[in-house]
From Swiss-Prot:
Protein purpose: Catalyzes the interconversion of 2-phosphoglycerate and 3-phosphoglycerate.
Active site residues according to the UniProt entry: 11 (tele-phosphohistidine intermediate), 89 (proton donor/acceptor)
Sites where the protein binds substrate: 10-17, 23-24, 62, 89-92, 100, 116-117, 185-186
Organism: Cronobacter sakazakii (strain ATCC BAA-894)
The protein's name in its UniProt record: 2,3-bisphosphoglycerate-dependent phosphoglycerate mutase
Site (Transition state stabilizer): 184
Length: 250
């Protein structure tokens, strides 16, 4: 049976991950640790014998630079890459820039967990005159006002990620190309929920660690057979737990 593999990677730790702040569409770069994570992911993929024909990422530099470091480690810096806002992190609205633990102290752990992980829960929205509104950013100049979020739930993130998967990424896999996607915690959670047919309750508890390759294997009908992380299982579990704890009061 022919098996098709897809590799997903959440960007390495960003400067705002390190500061425990809601990031969303804010274009913060990788921390030093994040660069190291991305380089380690590239080495791991190379050691495991992976190479690719095409790459996808968002229009945010923490994901773009993660992909650069991975491809550099694979000696595939030349690889064609498509960047799309549809793979951006979920937009966190008026929470963007706020410290997660301080926000939990103010509103309570459960409210922040719902904002971070609730399926259809949207954080407080931005207003269009807020400097954080994406309509002020030239990279989104070609988007319609209806496409520009003031806030997003995971459900709304799915509404942009899954059509992009079905219309753009999946056809490339079906043509036989080997694909890697470097994206974000919630855009990847959106895709994982769809691929694994997870319930709203199950996705609430899913935490994707930074900088760890996640491999999906598909059968000839492009249905997922299994998925697994590459690397040390204990280290990966610890990183996932750290993601879960970010939104708790200290």
């Amino acid at each position: 049976m022919a098996v098709t593999k897809l590799v997903l990677v959440r960007h390495g730790e960003s400067q705002w991950n390190n500061e425990n702040r809601f990031t969303g569409w804010y274009d913060v770069d990788l921390s030093e640790k994040g660069v190291s994570e991305a380089k380690a992911a590239g080495k791991l993929l190379k050691d495991e014998g992976y190479s690719f024909d095409f790459a996808y990422t968002s229009v945010l530099k923490r994901a773009i630079h993660t992909l650069w470091n991975i491809l550099d480690g694979l000696d595939q810096a030349w690889l064609p890459v498509e960047k799309s806002w549809k793979l951006n992190e979920r937009h966190y609205g008026a929470l963007q820039g706020l410290n997660k633990a301080e926000t939990a102290e103010k509103y309570g752990d459960e409210q922040v967990k719902q904002w971070r992980r609730g399926f259809a829960v949207t954080p407080p929205a931005l207003t269009k005159d807020d400097e954080r509104y994406p309509g002020h950013d030239p990279r989104y100049a070609k988007l319609s006002e209806q496409e520009l979020p003031l806030t997003e739930s995971l459900a709304l993130t799915i509404d942009r990620v899954i059509p992009y998967w079905n219309e753009t990424i999946l056809p490339r896999l079906k043509s036989g190309e080997r694909v890697i996607i470097a994206a974000h915690g919630n855009s990847l959670r959106a895709l994982v929920k769809y691929l694994d047919n997870m319930s709203e309750e199950e996705i609430l508890e899913l935490n994707i660690p930074t900088g760890v390759p996640l491999v999906y294997e598909f059968d000839e009908n492009f249905k997922p057979i299994k998925h697994y992380y590459l690397g040390n299982a204990d280290e990966i579990a610890a990183k996932a737990a750290a993601v879960a704890n970010q939104g708790k009061a200290k």
